[in-house]
């Protein structure tokens, strides 16, 4: 998938901050990018990770557009004020985390926005890393209008009764029977949330309910191995898994 742009091929995109409806009818900010041209284009909702609605989220939004997707990354941290992403996400953590209900409604707003665009091809996927990976799976089990979902090392899919909180009242694994689309999972074997054992439990639930899924697990990789600004970055594993993400979305959304 990399370096497949022909040298005489036109490429252009529009990337900007927009306003869209979210949880409780709130107007929230979102970062959106779309290919230039008439389309039609498939859509992707990128759910922010725990570090916040940050520069990396914007970069990944544009990366998907470079590959032909209209992409929206909603600011699920909007209710905690404005400032540097890390400061705002810290406020969310102090408050017990962004409630699942709020995130799902923000994702629904982003999906509805994508489907309303005149250049949409009618298909959309969701993806998230870290807590966003958990939310991507939860969205695929809870919302309509999702044709493919990618969970990148999402911790908290498997939860004990003691792990449940008012913000996270249900373990996503308990909703596996409601998964409505194909699922791709990307995991590092050296991480503790999720642990390889928790990934095993997730996979067992998917098999039990006969779901369409593919999990890829990488040795010598832990949490956030895509993040090139961290010591956790693993170039070979990151590149291989990005190829799998583009192949997965391409087969299911570019129809």
Describe the predicted segments one by one:
Residues 1-255:
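N-terminal cap/leader regions of alpha/beta-hydrolase-fold enzymes
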